[in-house]
Amino acid sequence: MTRFMTRFGTMGAAALAVLLTSAVDATAQMPTATPEQRTAGTQVTEIRFATEELVVRRDETVTLEATLFDAEGNPVEGAIALIFARGGLSPSLSILSGPSIELTGQQPGSGSLIAAIMVPESDGSMFGLAGVRQLATLPVTVLDHPAASIELDDLSHTPYTGTSLQMSGTVMTDRGAKHTTASISWRSSDPSVAAVTGSGILTGLAAGTVTVSASTENGITADATISVVENPVRSISMTPGTASTRTGDVVEFDIVARDVEGRAVTDIALDLAVSGLEGNGGFVFDDGTFVAEETGAYRVLASTGPASAAAIVEVSARQGPVAVELVAHGPRADVATSDLWVFEGRDGEDYAYTGTHAQGGGQRMFVWRVTDPTNPVLVDSVVVDARVVNDVKVSDDASWAIITRENASTRRNGIVVLDLEDPAHPTVMAEMTDGLTGGIHNVWIMGDIVYAVNDGTNAMNIIDMSDPANPQHAGRWELRPGETNKSLHDVWAENGYAYLSYWDDGLVILDVGAGSHGGTPTEPQFVSSISYPQGNTHVAWRNRDYVFLGDEIGTADGMRGFIHVIDVSDVENPREVAKYDLPEAGAHNVWVEDDVLYIAYYQGGVRIVDVSGTLRGDLYRQGRELGFFRTRAAEGQGLQANSANAWGAQLFKGHLFVSDMTSGLWVVKHAQPRPITF
């Protein structure tokens, strides 16, 4: 067996931040190492894996051997190596304390294993992992199971001559699952009747019948019989909803195709196009909507066969971003800050509760009095056994709160319920660990029900809080029960639906009392789901008919990932219609209120975005950003000076409260009211 040697090199804080702030939150799963194990780790200079590349099939479990060596090439006994899986493998963190670990293929594609050695904590802390240094990588390829069949989709419109339609289908594996990487090639039996491109764009050329064949690289085929019909359209009329608009505002067209007798032809796919007469950033979509990223005059064209129509739309600029003013900073330079919740206590005072992450030890929830937002006052803290207190939520009546626990020294994680009779000095009312010992990453409170994200099972636990001092299990829901190739990160619920951020499985929508699919708060029913190639679905928040999904993607250049805008007006068929993509940073947690989206955007600080009206295209490029503030702490005012790492954002009584992982609590205020989109 070929052996592959990789020398360890020290990883910088920025690169380690990319690794450790991913949604698997590996810091929460860190083992406890003895002083002897950490001392042994100081001797390690090399790792030798028993392969040059790890290749594994989806759902297959393999054993990976690895040996640690010192500078003289001698094996090192007693040290602990941490193996982080980036892309396609489970578990996300393995502890190499023996000769091998077991890994399971999860998501087909390319990735890597990153190894770190545990050393004495006095040797330094690297972004949340005190006493961890010296990393190596091993390339990984996860293969899907062989393609076994193709399921062809119906065409969206009647295939008339002179029109083009997209053929589509799903490749299924020999295990009955959707193939994640296979592509389909297309061929027409008679290109004089209907031509089809290799990617499946079918164009009707003459009335008649053809067979369109779909095939995969391994020879799996499927056929569809297509009847092309003579195009009946002789005229088209189109009227824009408005002839003048702003960048980012969507214009809807009333487009009607008619036959020779003036009857509307409704089952035809018209060709839509846009050209810039004075601008170069206009887009027209299949549903007849238009939006522009740049100012200017645009000509929108609808055509089919010999018929066509056009309309001109004038586009002016939106008002640009305005100042976001710093109101106050509550610095924390001793421990990393996680999420926050701001509320009015039962004593009439306002409070912000902030959690803590592993760097600096975690173990605390801080209590800030923010009745005067210009002067946040740290009045108390709650100490629990947990290296990570990732989330904090407060009940609707502000009588109790929940904080989550991960990586407790006892391995008994779960949730802690706080009594808020005195919100300035909350006390522990109850703990719940049974069935939750793997750790709880996030929670959402809906009345007397708490939905909890279980790290150990990747399921959503349902907890009855009708008696907060005695929480009870009330149910559970998970995607693909019994399977391990999944990762649940967050849950948000409102108006009878729950929105689960299921990482590479995307957004999962459940009926938890809406009544549309027979679900109740304790017996959820599946409604629909939507995923996208990059995966890493980290957070979801619904506003009107849109769900805003945030990615969390670590790269060598820092955090990346953006906001996907999902149209759920038809809740059974969610579709992505827009995005907000800040190029130089990565999205984390979000808050939406009064059609304004607030995004804690890691190194991009907090971003404020107008999400009123109909949404299409790239909201960032359209100029919908209303303002931003970079949460950069001064020297001595945070764990890392002059470096934003925004974690969470919440609007409360006109002020925006932001938690920053490396600098604590910030209070800012936008200098103008929300603009109105007509």
Which role does the model predict for each range below?
Residues T2-A13:
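Bacterial N-terminal signal peptides that target proteins for export
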Residues G12-S22:
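Bacterial N-terminal signal peptides
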Residues V24-T27:
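Sec/Tat signal peptide C-region and signal peptidase I cleavage site
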Residues Q29-P321:
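Extracytoplasmic soluble-region selector
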Residues S235, T239-T242, G282, E293-F678:
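Feature marking well-ordered beta-strand scaffolds used for ligand recognition
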